[in-house]
Amino acid sequence: MNSYKGVIFDFNGTLFFDNPKHVLAWGKISEEIRHHGISEEELHEHFNGVPNNKIIEYLFEGQCTDEQKQKYSLLKEQYYREFCKEDKETFHLVAGATEFFDKLKNNNIPFTIASASIKPNIDFFVESFHLDHWINPDDIVYDDGTYENKIMMFKKAAHILGLEVSDCLIIEDSLSGIENAYKAGCRNIIVIDSANKREECPPVHESCVSAPCGYGFFLLSHA
């Protein structure tokens, strides 16, 4: 643990594997707007990694108001939370996450979360997974509408930890998250390969490391 002074976690797809719940929620929204679900092709081209308001614009074929975007964005997240709670078998942090939190605490290494989730979802995660046992909820960086991109979110999270991004280890799962972590100045990035897209990662030096959390990951380190 001597190669970094702090840790910044992404959340969705990193500490909590929840992608199927997002797909179900968007499918329900699509049914309400278009009266049919979403195809696999649409999912990859118009949904994955796309902000809620852009997805809703797509579902309305560009003909929607700001009020409709707000309404359906909040409704989608409500459906998402309901689907999470209904599936008790998968509604938990990834195996070993809390042990890793404890290990960081015991080594006096500060850590927090930088997530693109909105505040109601963050509150939902804190309450459901008792994240406040390890992290001050006020220190969690989330999408409050003020961040231009996740680069700024990573920088804010590092600032909260009292560190430079270059002194942090960032744990991510998405290709855009990996790229933004690098652009923010991080050179130690752990990738949780929950989407099985390891071969699509940027061309960097890759070092396999033993997982402290009991789930598969690999380390991307940039010279």
Language model features with spans:
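Acidic, Mg2+-coordinating phosphoryl-transfer loop and its flanking beta/alpha structural elements
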Residues: 170-208
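Conserved Rossmann-like nucleotide-cofactor binding loop
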Residues: 14, 21, 119-120, 176, ...
